[in-house]
Amino acid sequence: MPPKGKADTAGYQQLKKDLSAQAPGKLYILHGEETYLRDYCLNQLKELILSGGMGTFNFHEIPAKEMSPRRLEEALDCLPMMAQRTLVQVTDFDLFKAGEKDREAYAKLFEELPDYVCLVFVYDLIPYKGDARTKLAGAIKRSGVVVNFARQETGELVKWVRRRFRALGKDIDGNLASELIFLCGDLMTNLIGEIEKIGAYAKGAQITRADIDAVATPQLDTVVFRMTDA
């Protein structure tokens, strides 16, 4: 598996704090390779803000190809209907590749976000590349939270793997959970499918190495490692 660098987790910790307090902020930039965790947190935001019968009316999604300062301003100006907040989502729009005039307009909009708005930029198919030298980056820093969903540390992953198996009515010990992570990689996005597959296959309540070997799909790096280590 690729080596893990020390990712900046401050944004992720702030988002978790906001979700726990049921008090979402006004601006989030969600990016990073751990898409399972990103989508989980995005869904948590939606559940908090869009719960109730008028959720559809309070959710505004802007396709990247339609994005402009004017289009964004129109969405931000939509008042919530029978709710406290609205959620505006923009996916795969490269803010920092916009023209200078547009960047300045976005910065102004970010600085003046209404209290009822939660604006979320999701980076899925394109990377997020901020430029700290720009006014736009300053506006994002002052008004919002940039959340990098990086690969999780092994200790946290082991706990998560065990929780996911328990949700399926199964149990797996810590050492075997670590072996599963080594075998299938340390991305939750990949592991969740393997966990569900193994859980469905296993006959007993306790997951065994035989269960994993029978149905898990090892990542290529692990196969090569085993061949060279043989």
Over which residues does each language-model region extend?
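Conserved beta/loop motifs at nucleotide-recognition and modification sites
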Residues: 1-230
